[in-house]
């Protein structure tokens, strides 16, 4: 009796206590050849038919060589499921474990509760004996901490969330309300829906979001208070998990609030589908083969046989435990067998049989049921395994569905509001914002009131908006019939995301600011602004089709020409100008050298005319070289030698080419249009090179900023420009005009507009990062399709083109920049001022030089006068000295002559007359100023012996024969007359003492 009590108590304690299990003894192991040849399979079944079918299936299995190896036999050991879980535990120990069962198949009546299958799972799991359930669908059995060896051929209830997602994707519903009970299964289905949707919507275009979660206590009596919240929500699609009893209460109260009629969509689980007051049009799910115990029994047996066969071929299987009273039993083979069972994937009577890590059935098929009149259930679709794609597939025949209110057309699934909260932002030319004056009470006809969003200051809310987007909004509201309240962005930003971690989770959450943040947080219904469509924004909001296609471009100020004072120097580079200047003087020097060293250049010929041109000197050579280059007439100073003249011709050809090239390039620089841009586009090396002194920027947190973040090849450029980014586009454009910013990168539409109204601005390069402007809406907004269709119609009708001409190209104030650019520029004083300044410099230089020359000449004249005075004094002194010498010589000769006459009067002698006019001194001019004093006839007569004695003797011989006698000056003088004045006749003597000075 004591032993029986111990056996009875052991399994009961095993339900709550986990014992430490000692390692299995090595002696209990078997080699592959020592594997058991017989395997007992236990069955805890709900009725006799199931027991009989279980036995029959085991017998048939033994003849199936595909699943049963040779020398292996299976036997069945069955017991009846008892509603009392304690009795069930005793029966499992006494009738199954005592017979060494390797696994247990368990089923129960659906109306009897799940406590008995749980008792079987606890008891078998304590000894690591695998349990295969064929009817238990509660979420609790998925917990492997409790049901360590339990797996099932039916899916749990919460797996219906997977089917919900497929149905929502099929019907394109994007916003739902989930209603669930607060028990384990209700919370499990909510968690499954939220978890699976995270990965499910990566593969589909339409993403469903949960707008409202309604949780209720089981066995409720009224659902009215929850319906009030549901009625104010926007979604009209209800996903409900509830028991049959709770579903009756919910459907009853929902009908009273008219929430089961037209426009509403109910998708429920299996239990709620069987409520006796399920409204017409409700869609529900029903598991295929849910009540086919025979099919599940067969599938479970064959899954078990398949696992044992593979295990036999791979490892040793120890015998199953036999004694429930042995607390030291730890059947490792049972644990390994459980792993083999979870890896099975076979095609059975109930479909494709496979399990997840929790041992729950996957690939289970469902029928989509549509409730019609008188609670008739009509199958309108199937969720089944597609063997070709190896995954589940949803097939629904929409034409067979009758929706609530007996409608054949699919409801929108959302309450469509007709009065919308709209936001916009100031961005020329799409939205112009004007503050109303103090005496104004309303906006102009083409304007709309646009106060600041959520701003309580009444004076700050008086704004009027007009522009491209406002005209589009006016036409759009007329086309799809809605009213609106328009407001301005409170912070003036389109919005960007900030990564935050408020919950301590591993992943960071994006929080949006600006217009996008208002839309994401559902404080606004629509954004009508030049909102660029990009992946980051599209993840959180909806976009209509683009109302304007555009891209990103670069705005810069048109490059100005070089300094106007030296415009005429632009045709040649500085290097070329220097080379020309050097060439002029080098050629001049070579010309001079050639002409100087040429035998026909420097020296005149003996027979040449006295008027022959002078030889070329260095200054004349420089003058010649400059004259040829500047095409001026050369009247003198040309080369004389042939070699120099050849060089002169070559230099003339060089000058012709240089002058012609200069003239052509001067026309190109001064007359033709100036260059359009400095940059070639986004691929310009000056933008990509971070070391280049070039400032570029965009707007912080804008779509352009996000584009640069995404592009890896632009990362270096983005890091450079990030510090220069502006808060608004208006500030950046003003800095471009002022020259503070060299390149502003922004949306092409805005920059083309700015360039069209200011001829000093220009867009550089081709568009990149092409996208479009769209109207932003909340995720799942019912207005998305209507807005998109209206915009497409606007494109087809030409309305959008009309807006482009009116606002983008700025027709009413646009300057004709294109005509201005194509008209040839005429040269004026501004362009040629440098040439006139050069002439002025030349004139000033000439005047300066002449002043210097005059001053220098005056200095030279003074110096020359001093030299002339000194020379005259010297000449006078020299003349006086020579006169004295002459007189003395004459006196000496006179004395000698007189002595000779007195002593011996030699015949034939003649007195020599010294006539100053006839015989002047060497270098002395003839004239009365040179007459001797006291000589009235200005002639001194002396006797000339050569005339009297020796007529053939020359004066030089006479001077040599008579020392001391001065030699008369011979040269270009008149011939001596033979007749002398009487005073100086031969033999005439006179006193010459008066001649002594």
UniProtKB/Swiss-Prot annotation:
CDD domains per the UniProt record, alphabetical: PBP1_iGluR_NMDA_NR1, PBP2_iGluR_NMDA_Nr1
InterPro entries the UniProt entry points to: ANF_lig-bd_rcpt (IPR001828), CaM-bd_C0_NMDA_rcpt_NR1 (IPR018882), Glu/Gly-bd (IPR019594), Iono_Glu_rcpt_met (IPR001508), Ionotropic_Glu_rcpt (IPR015683), Iontro_rcpt_C (IPR001320), NMDA1-like_ligand-bd (IPR049872), NMDA1-like_N (IPR049873)
Disruption phenotype annotation: Flies exhibit disruption of olfactory learning.
Residue intervals annotated with topology Cytoplasmic: 595-651, 853-997
One of the Pfam families matching this protein, by short name: Lig_chan
Extracellular topological intervals: 27-573, 673-831
Region Disordered, residue ranges: 970-997
GO cellular component: ionotropic glutamate receptor complex; membrane; neuron projection; NMDA selective glutamate receptor complex; plasma membrane; postsynaptic density; postsynaptic membrane; synapse
Superkingdom of this protein's organism: Eukaryota
Main location as per UniProt: membrane
Residues annotated to bind glycine: 530-532, 537, 703, 747
UniProt-annotated location(s): Cell membrane; Postsynaptic cell membrane; Postsynaptic density
Membrane topology: Multi-pass membrane protein
Membrane spanning residue stretches: 574-594, 652-672, 832-852
Entry comment describing in which tissues the protein is expressed: Highly expressed in adult heads: in the brain and ring gland. Low expression throughout the entire brain is also seen. Higher expression levels were observed in some scattered cell bodies and part of their fibers, including those from several pairs of DPM (dorsal-posterior-medial) neurons surrounding the calyx, DAL (dorsal-anterior-lateral) and DPL (dorsal-posterior-lateral) neurons in the lateral protocerebrum (LP), VAL (ventral-anterior-lateral) neurons in the anterior protocerebrum, and two pairs of VP (ventral-posterior) neurons in the posterior protocerebrum.
Polar residues bias: start-end ranges: 987-997
One example GO MF annotation: signaling receptor activity
SUPFAM superfamilies: Periplasmic binding protein-like I, Periplasmic binding protein-like II, Voltage-gated potassium channels
Signal peptide (UniProt feature, chain positions): 1-26
Assigned keywords, A-Z: Calcium, Cell membrane, Disulfide bond, Glycoprotein, Ion channel, Ion transport, Ligand-gated ion channel, Magnesium, Membrane, Phosphoprotein, Postsynaptic cell membrane, Receptor, Signal, Synapse, Transmembrane, Transmembrane helix, Transport
A GO biological-process term: phototaxis
Residues the record marks as carrying a glycan: 258, 314, 345, 397, 454, 481, 501, 693
Quaternary data: Forms a heteromeric NMDA channel with Nmdar2.
Function, as annotated: NMDA receptor subtype of glutamate-gated ion channels with high calcium permeability and voltage-dependent sensitivity to magnesium. Mediated by glycine. This protein plays a key role in synaptic plasticity, synaptogenesis, excitotoxicity, memory acquisition and learning. It mediates neuronal functions in glutamate neurotransmission. Is involved in the cell surface targeting of NMDA receptors. Plays a role in associative learning and in long-term memory consolidation.
Family: Belongs to the glutamate-gated ion channel (TC 1.A.10.1) family.
Protein name, entry field: Glutamate [NMDA] receptor subunit 1
Organism for this UniProt entry: Drosophila melanogaster (Fruit fly)
Gene: Nmdar1
């Amino acid at each position: 009796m004591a032993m029986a009590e111990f056996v009875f108590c052991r399994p009961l304690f095993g339900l709550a206590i986990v014992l430490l299990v000692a390692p299995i003894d090595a002696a209990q192991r078997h080699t592959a050849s020592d594997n058991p040849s017989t395997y007992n399979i236990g069955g805890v079944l709900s009725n006799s038919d199931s027991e009989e079918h279980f036995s029959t299936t085991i017998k048939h299995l033994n003849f199936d060589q595909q699943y049963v190896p040779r020398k292996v036999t299976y036997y069945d050991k069955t017991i009846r499921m008892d509603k009392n879980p304690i009795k069930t535990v005793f029966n499992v120990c006494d009738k199954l474990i005592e017979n060494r069962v390797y696994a247990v198949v368990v089923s129960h009546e659906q109306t009897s509760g799940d406590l008995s299958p749980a008792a079987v799972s606890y008891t078998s799991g304590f000894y690591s004996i695998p349990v295969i359930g064929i009817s238990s669908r509660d979420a609790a059995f998925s917990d492997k901490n409790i049901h360590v060896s339990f797996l099932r051929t039916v899916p749990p209830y919460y797996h219906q969330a997977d089917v919900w997602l497929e149905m929502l994707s099929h019907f394109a519903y994007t916003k739902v309300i989930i209603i669930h009970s607060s028990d384990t299964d209700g919370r499990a289905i909510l968690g499954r829906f939220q978890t699976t949707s995270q990965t499910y919507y990566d593969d589909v275009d339409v993403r469903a979001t949960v707008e409202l979660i309604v949780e209720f206590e089981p066995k409720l009596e009224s659902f009215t208070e929850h319906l009030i919240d549901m009625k104010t929500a926007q979604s009209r699609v209800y996903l409900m998990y509830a028991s049959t009893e709770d579903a009756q209460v919910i459907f009853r109260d929902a009908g009273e609030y008219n929430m089961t009629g037209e426009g509403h969509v109910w998708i429920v689980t299996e239990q709620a589908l069987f409520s006796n007051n399920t409204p017409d049009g409700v869609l529900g799910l029903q598991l295929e083969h849910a009540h086919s115990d025979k099919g599940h029994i067969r599938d479970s047996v064959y899954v078990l046989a398949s696992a044992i066969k593979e295990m036999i071929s791979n490892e040793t299987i120890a015998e199953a435990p036999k004694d429930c009273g042995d607390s030291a039993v730890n059947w490792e083979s049972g644990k390994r067998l459980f792993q083999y069972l979870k890896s099975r994937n076979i095609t059975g009577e109930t479909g494709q049989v496979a399990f997840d890590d929790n041992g729950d059935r996957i690939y289970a098929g469902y029928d989509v049921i549509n409730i019609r009149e008188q609670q008739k259930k009509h199958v309108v679709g199937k969720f089944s395994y597609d063997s070709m794609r190896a995954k589940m597939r949803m097939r629904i025949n929409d034409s067979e569905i009758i929706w609530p209110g007996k409608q054949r057309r699919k409801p929108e699934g959302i309450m469509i509001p007709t009065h919308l909260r709209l936001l916009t932002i100031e961005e020329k030319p799409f939205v112009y914002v004007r503050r109303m004056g103090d005496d104004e009470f309303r906006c102009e006809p083409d304007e709309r009131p646009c106060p600041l969003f959520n701003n309580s200051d009444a004076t700050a809310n008086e704004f009027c908006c007009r522009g491209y987007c406002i005209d589009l909004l006016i036409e759009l509201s007329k086309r799809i019939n809605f009213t609106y309240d328009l407001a301005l962005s409170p912070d003036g930003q389109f919005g960007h995301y900030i990564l935050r971690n408020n919950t301590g989770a591993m992943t960071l959450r994006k929080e949006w600011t600006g217009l996008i943040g208002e839309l994401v947080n559902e404080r606004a219904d629509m954004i009508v602004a030049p909102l660029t469509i990009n992946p980051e924004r599209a993840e959180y909001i909806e976009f209509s089709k683009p109302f304007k296609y555009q891209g990103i471009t670069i705005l810069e100020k048109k490059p100005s020409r070089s300094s106007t004072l030296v415009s005429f120097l632009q045709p040649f580079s500085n290097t070329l100008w220097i080379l020309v200047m050097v060439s002029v003087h080098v050629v001049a020097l070579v010309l001079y050298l050639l002409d100087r060293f040429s035998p026909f250049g420097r020296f005149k010929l003996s027979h040449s005319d006295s008027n022959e041109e002078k030889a070329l000197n260095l200054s004349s050579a420089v003058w010649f070289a400059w004259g040829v280059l500047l095409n001026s007439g050369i009247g003198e100073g040309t080369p004389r030698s042939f070699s120099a003249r050849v060089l002169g011709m070559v230099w003339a050809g060089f000058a012709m080419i240089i002058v012609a090239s200069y003239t052509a390039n001067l026309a190109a620089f001064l007359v033709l249009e100036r260059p359009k841009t400095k940059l070639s586009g986004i691929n310009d090396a000056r933008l990509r090179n971070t070391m280049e002194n070039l400032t570029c920027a965009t707007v912080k947190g804008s779509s352009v900023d996000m584009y640069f973040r995404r592009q890896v090849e632009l990362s270096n450029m983005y890091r450079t420009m990030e510090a220069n980014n502006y808060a608004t586009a208006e500030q950046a454009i003003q800095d471009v005009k002022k020259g503070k910013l060299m390149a502003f990168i922004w949306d092409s539409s805005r920059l083309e507009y700015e360039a069209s109204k200011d001829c000093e601005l220009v867009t550089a390069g081709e568009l990149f990062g092409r996208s479009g402007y769209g109207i932003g809406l909340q995720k799942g907004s019912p207005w998305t399709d209507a807005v998109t269709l209206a915009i497409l119609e606007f494109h087809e009708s030409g309305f959008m083109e009309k807006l482009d001409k009116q606002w983008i190209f700025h027709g009413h104030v646009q300057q004709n920049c294109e005509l201005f650019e194509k008209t040839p520029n005429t040269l004026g004083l501004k362009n040629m001022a440098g040439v006139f300044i050069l002439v002025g410099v030349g004139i000033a230089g000439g005047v300066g030089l002449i002043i210097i020359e005059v001053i220098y000449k005056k200095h030279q004249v003074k110096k020359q006068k001093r030299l002339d005075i000194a020379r005259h004094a010297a000449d006078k002194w020299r003349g006086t000295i020579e006169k004295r010498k002459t007189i003395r010589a004459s006196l000496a000769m006179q004395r000698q002559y007189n002595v000779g006459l007195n002593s011996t009067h030699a015949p034939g002698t003649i007195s020599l007359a010294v006539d100053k006019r006839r015989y002047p001194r060497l270098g002395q001019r003839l004239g009365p100023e040179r007459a001797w004093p006291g000589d009235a006839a200005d002639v001194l007569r002396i006797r000339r012996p050569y005339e009297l004695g020796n007529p053939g003797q020359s004066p030089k011989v006479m001077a040599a024969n008579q020392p001391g006698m001065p030699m008369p000056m011979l040269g270009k003088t008149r011939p001596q007359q033979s007749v002398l004045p009487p005073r100086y006749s031969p033999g005439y003597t006179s006193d010459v003492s008066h001649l002594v000075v």
